[in-house]
Amino acid sequence: MARAMSFDRIVVVDWSAHSTPKVGADSIWLAVDDRRSLVVENPATRADASHRLTSIVEAAVDSTTLIGVDFSLGYPIGTARALGCTGRPWHAVWTLLADSIVDDERNRNNRFEVAAASNASIGDGPGPFWGCPPSRRVEHCLSSTKPERTAGHPPEWRHVESVLRRNGRRPFSSWQLLGAGAVGSQSLLGIPVLERLRRRFPQRVDVWPFTTGLGLPPLRPGQVVVAEIWPTLVTGTDTTGPVRDARQVADVATWLRGLDRGGELRGLFEPDVAAARRSAVIDEEGWVLGVSGVDGPARNMTVR
C-alpha cells in the first residue's frame, strides 16, 4: 500500500575516489538515521561501502529509505549522444560505466582509462574529461590540466550547476577528475555501485528524478529513493568534530530528518525547473536535492 511522504531511514553518503583503502579525512563516510538514532560510519573501501548499502536495502523490505549521495548522477545534455549511447540517456551512461569501470576490493580502479576511452569516443584530442596524475595521462585522450573545449564536447555544466553558479555557488564540473573538491572521479566510481543496486533490486530502487520525474509519488513499503545532494548547501551547528566529512553527512541527515518530520521534505523533490529544461533534467542531467530551479538553493538549509 502506498504511503504519504515519510522516510523510515535516511542515509547520507560522502563518496571517495581514493585508489587505496582509507579512513578518516577525505574518505567514505555514511550517516544512517533510522528515526531512533543517527550512526556515522567510515568504511575503508568502496567495496565495503557498497556491501553496506546493499545490506541496508536488503533489510528495508517493509520500510522506506532515502539515500543521498554527494556526486553527480548525470552528465550535461548531449553526453550520451556524444558517447554513441542509445536509449534513455541517463541509463545508457550508467550502463556504460557499470560495464566499463573495474574497481577492486582494495580500491584499485581504471577510472582514468575509462575517461580516456570516453574522450576518444567523443572526439579527437583530450576532453571533456580531464585531470589525472602525470603517470596516468593518455596522449591525445586525457590530460592532467584542463584542455580547450571544442565544438564536439558536451557542455561543461549541467543546468543545476549553472543555477548554482548564478547564485554565487562554486560547484565543480563532472568532467574534472582530480583536484581539491573535484567530484568527477567520484561519479565515475559511484554510479556503477548505484547501477548494481538497481539491478539487484529492480522493483524497489528509484533514482530521482530519472525514474520518478521531478516529484515523488506516495512511497511504497520497501521503496528506496536515491538522490543527489550537495553537502555544502547545509549549514551545520557542530563545528568541533575532528573530521569535516563526518560532520557534514551527519548534518545533512539531521537536516533531511527535520524536514521529513515537519512535512516539508516533499518540496525538495519538486524544484521549479523551467518547462524547456525539464526533459533534459529528467532524461539525462539529474538535479540536486534542495536546489530551486529558478532562485537557486532552498532558503532554509540550516540544521535544526
Outline where the language-model segments fall.
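RNase H-like (RuvC/DEDD) metal-dependent nuclease/polynucleotide-processing core
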Residues: 2-9, 15-66, 71-304
